[in-house]
Amino acid sequence: MQCALYDAGRCRSCQWITQSVNEQLSAKTADLHRLLTGLPVEQWCASIGGPEQHFRNKAKMVVSGSVEKPLFGMLHRDGTPVDLCGCPLYPASFAPVFSALKPFIARAGLTPYNVARKRGELKYLLLTESQFDGGMMLRFVLRSETKLTQLRAALPWLRAQLPQLRVITANIQPVHMAIMEGETEIYLTDQQALAERFNDVPLWIRPQSFFQTNPTVASRLYATARDWVGQLPVRHMWDLFCGVGGFGLHCATPQMQLTGIEIAPEAIACAKQSAAELGLTRLHFQALDSTQFATAQGETPDLVLVNPPRRGIGKPLCDYLAQMAPRFIIYSSCNAQTMAQDIRHLPNYRIQSVQLFDMFPHTAHYEVLTLLCRL
């Protein structure tokens, strides 16, 4: 992928950009084989790639500069700003949004936050696009609620320029730290969730719910999990760390009993909305800690699907799964190193299938899906 920002030495986020996508995929596949050394794998499925550019559905922009000339991008460690509006990972549809937002910031009087001086209001812009209908969600991350009245007053102009903005919020992040968002979310539109659809499954994106940033590859990941579960005798399933329910909603059938657990209430609200649209009455989603939920249950499902953050599921949950001994475990991971550690804590399971998904091109990161069967 050609990138003017990389060529100019202004951005090094895509550290593997000089390698072809095939070379990247080969290196990632070799890394996964290395991490699973000593763990017999019955079936290595072909690695799945995707587009090398314009694939991201989300932009996270630090706002710097002045209110008259704001700059969207990132800050180097020395505080030097870099404009990332031309990043080739973003779809072409983002450019007109960035262009309209620059004069809007002046209209609304949203002074960019100055890290060195600890002054200003606008810290970040978070933009998400739906691949389903092109609708967008825009979040203004502010230091305080001081400029909310001005922001609301200026919004009609912005919405006239950008009718694709379906959900607009102000997130309040008062702490002087590199934290992307705060706990308080103030909706500035009637619509509060962005509609998305993968493989004919309705999904919803809310401001504080995690959603994969590479829709093309994510849809194939969910479809693969659905196909694997469809070949197994599963009538009762848990979906732990379920997020907005992508895995569970793909895998569920009208006859299946499924419980999805996720700590974030916003994500659970999305999952419940999707289940209602699909008419799946035996799906139950709850906002709980996944480990605490699992270890408090007395019944054993046929299959447990886990999709933890980078730290993995950890030894306590591994030990409980080993004791509970469901017939099948599907492990989706964005960190194969912690996944391999967790699998080694499940000695009574064999690896039936493994498949790598290149969710993060031009970096060393990837997603992996693993099917474990009880011995």
UniProtKB/Swiss-Prot annotation:
GO terms for molecular function: 4 iron, 4 sulfur cluster binding; iron ion binding; rRNA (uridine-C5-)-methyltransferase activity. [4Fe-4S] cluster binds at residues 3, 11, 14, 87. Coiled coil: none annotated. It comes from the Bacteria. The active site is at residue 334. Keywords: 4Fe-4S, Iron, Iron-sulfur, Metal-binding, Methyltransferase, rRNA processing, S-adenosyl-L-methionine, Transferase. The keyword Iron applies. One of its GO terms (biological process) is rRNA base methylation. It catalyses: uridine(747) in 23S rRNA + S-adenosyl-L-methionine = 5-methyluridine(747) in 23S rRNA + S-adenosyl-L-homocysteine + H(+). It is an enzyme of class 2 (transferase). The keyword Iron-sulfur applies. S-adenosyl-L-methionine binds at residues 212, 241, 262, 307. Pfam families: tRNA_U5-meth_tr. Its EC number is 2.1.1.189. Belongs to the class I-like SAM-binding methyltransferase superfamily. RNA M5U methyltransferase family. RlmC subfamily. Catalyzes the formation of 5-methyl-uridine at position 747 (m5U747) in 23S rRNA. NCBIfam families: meth_trns_rumB. PANTHER family: RNA M5U METHYLTRANSFERASE, TRNA (URACIL(54)-C(5))-METHYLTRANSFERASE. This is 23S rRNA (uracil(747)-C(5))-methyltransferase RlmC. It comes from Salmonella schwarzengrund (strain CVM19633). The lineage of its organism: Bacteria, Pseudomonadati, Pseudomonadota, Gammaproteobacteria, Enterobacterales.
